[in-house]
Amino acid sequence: MSSGKVLQVIGPVVDVEFPLDEKLPEINDALKIKESDGKTLTTEVALELGDGVVRTIAMDGTDGLQRGMEVENTGASISVPVGDDTLGRVFNVLGEPVDNGPKFGPDAKRMPIHRDAPKYDDLNNATEILETGIKVIDLLAPYVRGGKIGLFGGAGVGKTVLIQELIHNIAQGHNGISVFTGVGERTREGNDMYYEMKASGVLEKTAMVYGQMNEPPGARMRVALTGLTIAEYFRDVKGQDVLLFIDNIFRFTQAGSEVSALLGRIPSAVGYQPTLATEMGQLQERITSTKKGSITSIQAVYVPADDYTDPAPATTFAHLDATTNLERRLTQIGIYPAVDPLASTSTALTPEIVGKEHYEVATQVQHVLQRYHELQDIISILGMDELSDEEKTIVARARRIQNFLSQSFSVASQFTGLPGKYVPLKETIKGFKEILAGKYDDLPEEAFRLVGPIEDVVEKAKKMKAETDEDSSED
């Protein structure tokens, strides 16, 4: 392969000059620079400047680089390890292990991170629901197999626990694999996530890729592609259903904006890169269902200053099939998962896709909860006595529904002391249908909280009654 020399270094941007009689590296090719301390720095070609000079973006710090250092053209884009050996491991953007585990040798299976989206002929055009076993999601904001879901929520509302439960349920219910990609978030959070997943027993079915906020923009921009490439192997070669978590998709855009400015491109709206829609599309179009398997992506979305018209979240929304909104108000009254049943949405919630019964039950649940929401002001000011009998019934059922939307999680059982429950979709629909019909109006509201299927509610109510009878007989 051809070799050149470092011409200039401007932060994470490295210009490299190649002899005019040698073949220039192509855009997205990886270059290797041997540093004086023996380490190798990888850069990626971003621009050709002419006269044998290319402008590259470094995937690590450029401290210690000097003009004239030798640069080797690898003749290919960055490639990362794939396959079963990646499970339970933590990687950086280059696919190098960062968990103090064994390194991957030259014989390890690898795939380039820059790949085309699947061809139209290879896509699975049937819309299938991906059952998660989590009642509130399956009923009100169902996930599509091969779809993209936006996860919204502030700090401490249970995003991580929900992500872990999804990983657990996909592994148990679908024998699926998960890939967690940390893009531009805090190193401490990545570290905590690793140990929490280890403790909850889901790590061996998960590959983790991190490009944290202290890393150069090149690494943060490409780390999502590294995680996606690992997921694509399990979909295309192993024929599996894969969950791909990206936390946070906004940081992917932010890193692209930094790189764009470093390359001297004229910024677009609000200072973002002019190639924003293209970069987002190249990533999102690779996340899909094929005839072999599927990649379903759950992406945490940070909304700058809560402005949903900002180009970064607005470009992301164009690709989403569903949104799962976590609400702090629900955590304060002990409803976990704290998914807002009225704010969460899904394009799949139509009778043609989920079926007539599911659609009708879901819309009735939303109607009852919306009516309860409207009546809360009256209740807080005037009290329950001012409501009509019909309104009192709606409030009573809405409270039971709200409690029944909560659920005990397997990954949280060590903290709650309650066994986790995977609830099949049929059971979920049956339970809510019977609550709406008034079948359980006589059971206490508390019996509906943090349980699995409706049978658990009946069982819990019996226990509560037995305990009450026991206490009264002792008195």
UniProtKB/Swiss-Prot annotation:
<dbReference type="GO" id="GO:0005524">
    <property type="term" value="F:ATP binding"/>
</dbReference>
<dbReference type="InterPro" id="IPR004100">
    <property type="entry name" value="ATPase_F1/V1/A1_a/bsu_N"/>
</dbReference>
<keyword id="KW-0375">Hydrogen ion transport</keyword>
<dbReference type="InterPro" id="IPR050053">
    <property type="entry name" value="ATPase_alpha/beta_chains"/>
</dbReference>
<comment type="subunit">
    <text>F-type ATPases have 2 components, CF(1) - the catalytic core - and CF(0) - the membrane proton channel. CF(1) has five subunits: alpha(3), beta(3), gamma(1), delta(1), epsilon(1). CF(0) has three main subunits: a(1), b(2) and c(9-12). The alpha and beta chains form an alternating ring which encloses part of the gamma chain. CF(1) is attached to CF(0) by a central stalk formed by the gamma and epsilon chains, while a peripheral stalk is formed by the delta and b chains.</text>
</comment>
<comment type="similarity">
    <text>Belongs to the ATPase alpha/beta chains family.</text>
</comment>
<dbReference type="GO" id="GO:0046933">
    <property type="term" value="F:proton-transporting ATP synthase activity, rotational mechanism"/>
</dbReference>
<dbReference type="InterPro" id="IPR055190">
    <property type="entry name" value="ATP-synt_VA_C"/>
</dbReference>
<dbReference type="InterPro" id="IPR020003">
    <property type="entry name" value="ATPase_a/bsu_AS"/>
</dbReference>
<keyword id="KW-1003">Cell membrane</keyword>
<protein>
    <recommendedName>
        <fullName>ATP synthase subunit beta</fullName>
        <ecNumber>7.1.2.2</ecNumber>
    </recommendedName>
</protein>
<dbReference type="GO" id="GO:0016887">
    <property type="term" value="F:ATP hydrolysis activity"/>
</dbReference>
<keyword id="KW-0406">Ion transport</keyword>
<dbReference type="Pfam" id="PF00006">
    <property type="entry name" value="ATP-synt_ab"/>
</dbReference>
<comment type="function">
    <text>Produces ATP from ADP in the presence of a proton gradient across the membrane. The catalytic sites are hosted primarily by the beta subunits.</text>
</comment>
<dbReference type="InterPro" id="IPR005722">
    <property type="entry name" value="ATP_synth_F1_bsu"/>
</dbReference>
<dbReference type="Pfam" id="PF22919">
    <property type="entry name" value="ATP-synt_VA_C"/>
</dbReference>
<keyword id="KW-0813">Transport</keyword>
<keyword id="KW-0139">CF(1)</keyword>
<dbReference type="InterPro" id="IPR027417">
    <property type="entry name" value="P-loop_NTPase"/>
</dbReference>
<keyword id="KW-0067">ATP-binding</keyword>
<dbReference type="GO" id="GO:0005886">
    <property type="term" value="C:plasma membrane"/>
</dbReference>
<feature type="binding site">
    <location>
        <begin position="153"/>
        <end position="160"/>
    </location>
    <ligand>
        <name>ATP</name>
    </ligand>
</feature>
<keyword id="KW-0066">ATP synthesis</keyword>
<dbReference type="InterPro" id="IPR003593">
    <property type="entry name" value="AAA+_ATPase"/>
</dbReference>
<keyword id="KW-1278">Translocase</keyword>
<dbReference type="Pfam" id="PF02874">
    <property type="entry name" value="ATP-synt_ab_N"/>
</dbReference>
<keyword id="KW-0547">Nucleotide-binding</keyword>
<dbReference type="InterPro" id="IPR000194">
    <property type="entry name" value="ATPase_F1/V1/A1_a/bsu_nucl-bd"/>
</dbReference>
<keyword id="KW-0472">Membrane</keyword>
<dbReference type="GO" id="GO:0045259">
    <property type="term" value="C:proton-transporting ATP synthase complex"/>
</dbReference>
<dbReference type="InterPro" id="IPR024034">
    <property type="entry name" value="ATPase_F1/V1_b/a_C"/>
</dbReference>
<dbReference type="InterPro" id="IPR036121">
    <property type="entry name" value="ATPase_F1/V1/A1_a/bsu_N_sf"/>
</dbReference>
